[in-house]
């Protein structure tokens, strides 16, 4: 049976993820919530640009219609 997208995201709960937005912005943080519209809640969120942290946000909500991709992040790997 094929994996469903929300199942993959559900397994990433309470883990670090990289969220790539349509306009090229990237955020990294711990995924603490999501819904069927892919609205994403990150804790310890950081904006990443050229592989470097440019701003720290703490807890943020990212609107789902801006999300291009969500990827698990291995600790220590960028």
UniProtKB/Swiss-Prot annotation:
User: Sm domain: from which residue to which, for each copy?
Assistant: 4-76
Q: Which GO terms describe its molecular function?
A: RNA binding
The record's section on Gene3D superfamilies has: 2.30.30.100
Identify the keywords attached in UniProt to this record, alphabetized: Ribonucleoprotein
Kindly indicate whether the keyword Ribonucleoprotein belongs to this entry: yes
- Its transmembrane ranges are none
Any GO BP: mRNA splicing, via spliceosome
Report the SUPFAM superfamilies cross-referenced here. Answer: Sm-like ribonucleoproteins (SSF50182)
Specify the domain of life of the species encoding this protein. Answer: Archaea
Family membership: Belongs to the snRNP Sm proteins family.
Q: Which HAMAP family match?
A: Lsm_RuxX (MF_00257)
Its name, as the record gives it, is Putative snRNP Sm-like protein
Q: What is the species of this protein?
A: Thermococcus onnurineus (strain NA1)
